[in-house]
């Protein structure tokens, strides 16, 4: 089996998503699954087998995260999906739409891991906007994204509920 993972974040950025991706990569490789990954380039990371890096620019106010170009992510994801059996999306940003588009174009099933309950902490990033309004918008976007998928993986019972 060949799986393509698509993410807006990966090492050297250390966070739960990067750690989860690496856990999937190790575990699935041990089971004989070929895993490909499309993720941002942060700087001068060495080339790594199975990892396609897309140019990324620092997020304003957050030097650890990267913004990836829409077209570059879509092109890299579509190319990497060739010969795959499944697309597994890891983040709900540009990678989500690139992974979904590549999967549909290649006729592949597409799943996502829903790592972050954005409706619970979006207020932290936009404190001047009403919390209830932000929560409803985040919930609506999450619902639309998840409903477009063939399956969703959640890392906890709280996320499932």
Where are these regions (language model features)?
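Membrane-proximal helix-turn-helix segments that form the acceptor-binding/catalytic region
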Residues: 105, 133-151
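Alpha-helix capping/helix-boundary segments
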Residues: 43, 94-95, 158-160
């Amino acid at each position: 089996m060949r799986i393509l993972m698509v993410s807006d974040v990966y090492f050297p950025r250390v966070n739960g998503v990067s750690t989860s991706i690496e856990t999937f990569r190790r575990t699935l490789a041990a089971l004989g699954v070929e895993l490909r990954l499309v993720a941002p380039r942060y700087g001068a990371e060495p080339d790594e087998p199975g990892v396609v890096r897309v140019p990324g620019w620092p997020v304003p106010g957050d030097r650890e995260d990267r913004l990836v170009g829409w077209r570059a992510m879509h092109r890299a994801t579509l190319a990497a999906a060739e010969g795959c059996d499944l697309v597994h999306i890891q983040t709900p940003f540009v990678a989500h739409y690139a992974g979904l588009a590549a999967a549909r174009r290649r006729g592949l099933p597409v799943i996502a891991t829903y790592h972050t309950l954005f409706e619970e902490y979006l207020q932290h990033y936009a404190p001047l906007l009403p919390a209830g309004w932000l929560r409803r918008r985040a919930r609506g976007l999450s619902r639309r994204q998840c409903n477009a998928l063939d399956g969703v993986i959640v890392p906890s019972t709280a996320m499932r509920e």
